[in-house]
Every structure is written in C-alpha cells, then in structure tokens.
C-alpha cells in the first residue's frame, strides 16, 4: 500500500488509512475515527484464526499465522480505553502494519478510505478531563468533513509495552568521554522521546527536546540566542522524527537548509517507517542518515561517523 502512493506524496503531506472503532460512552454508541500512516500499512485482512499468546497485556488477544509469520493481534479498542459497542461485534477486520521493523496486527471495525492531509492541519491532541480515552496513546488530531475529528495514534508506545525497546534502554555507555556537546531532537511520541533521551544521556550529550518541526525551529532560535555564531561549536547534530503534527521532519529539514545559520547542522532522521522510499527521500533532501527506531548500536555507530567527519 505504501509503494502505490509514495511517489505522489508532496512535501509536508501525509497519507492516512482512515479506520473506525465503534464504542459506547455513557450508554450511547459513537463512531471513533482514527488514522495510521499508509507507509506503515502492509495490508488489511478479515479476522484470522487466533492462537493463545501468554501475556499480562489484556489488549493483546492472541497471535495468528500470516504466510508463516507469527503476528500479535492488538485490540485497539482495549488499548485506547474504549468501551466497545457489542452490536458491532461481528464487524471486525485486521490492519497489518510494519514499523520499527516489527509486524503487528490491529483489530478495528472498518477501514474507510485513504486521506491525504497536510501536516500543518494536524494539531497535538488535547482532551477534556471527562474523556475516557487514554490520552497518552493519541499523538495528533485533524478536522475532516462535517466538522468531525480524526485521531492519529501513537502506536510506538505498544513496542515499549512489549519490551521491544529494552535494547535501547539497556545500551551500554561505551563512548561517554568522546561524545559531548548539545543535541536537538524532535519527536511527537512521548515514548520515543523517553527512549532517545535515555540513550543520548548515556552517551554524554546535553539534550534539547522538541515535539514537532515548529517547536524544533523555535528551540534552534533559543540555542542561537544562547551561543550566537559559536552554535557550530556546541550543537553537534539534530535528530528528527518524520511524522509530526504542525510540521513534519521533511519540512523541518527544508526550512533548516534555507537558513544560513543552521544549514550546516547534520540532520539524522530517526523514524518508525521502514521503507526504502522514505530512506531515499531523506538522503535526497540532505539528511546525513535515515535510521529506523530504535537500534541502539546502529544509532551510536552513525553518531560516531558524523562526529568523526566533522572533527
């Protein structure tokens, strides 16, 4: 699905698979509208035959065999914190995804269409105190037709629950004396920021965080006010996610390269999207590396190469 639409995608736009989950709130049924990046979706299948999967995570309801690959199935309604509409019990499909080099299946009620949306129309999520949805699992929102809201999910946090980021958290600090200076990193996922901050801190860097491209540009201005023309001596590189509300990583890099104060700064893309097109696009735009979250050893190797080159 990603390959079919990738060549048409413009800078600062995202294509989302629009899918629905039917829930109940105070006894009243409602339709939840959600989106996931097309680049992360491999296929959509009917409900498969499930096998038991021993886990204490109640939203993992089993595993299934897809062409000899065993894939865990996540009940998205449970994960988000939705009380399901039982009248829709038989209306279920599975969205097969791959991100962070991990395949997973997500149980939803229906997939409607593919939407092309500008990142500037995606806002960070905010909810009323009474809302029952687990707010930590929502990374952004955007308005669609009839003044409805589509929610973009932070699916990366599931990997943390599954302990698939443990290698990053437990990575040994073998270069602390060599690695020093400032690093700016951008990511809208709280889970990804936590993992990255932990690793960079172990490597000896001082860290400035940003939650999207706009915030990243603002943080750069703050660093320039702090260091002036000496910023070059202090800020070693920038690490940026690709998918972010308000301003995505590609547009952030484009803006960066237009500003002579910052155009020299090496930029590493650190993304959950693991397709060749995204990596090639990043290199064409001038990124020094495109990494798939999160391989701690490879990440450290890339940092070492950049610092050696700029020494």
From Swiss-Prot:
GO terms for biological process: chemotaxis; phosphorelay signal transduction system. CDD domains: CheW, REC_CheV-like. InterPro entries: Chemotax_regulator_CheV, CheW-like_dom_sf, CheW-lke_dom, CheY-like_superfamily, Sig_transdc_resp-reg_receiver. Disruption phenotype: Deletion mutant is fully chemotactic and forms swarms the same way as wild-type strain. Mutant appears however to change direction frequently and shows defects in mouse colonization. The keyword ATP-binding does not apply. Keywords: Phosphoprotein. Transmembrane segments: none annotated. Residues 182-308 form the Response regulatory domain. PROSITE patterns: CHEW (PS50851), RESPONSE_REGULATORY (PS50110). The modification 4-aspartylphosphate is found at residue 241. Pfam families: CheW, Response_reg. Gene3D superfamilies: 3.40.50.2300, CheA-289, Domain 4 (2.40.50.180), SH3 Domains (2.30.30.40). Residues 13-164 form the CheW-like domain. It comes from the Bacteria. PANTHER family: CHEMOTAXIS PROTEIN CHEV. Plays a role in chemotaxis signal transduction system in order to colonize the host stomach. May act as a phosphate sink to control the flow of phosphate to CheAY. This is Chemotaxis protein CheV3.
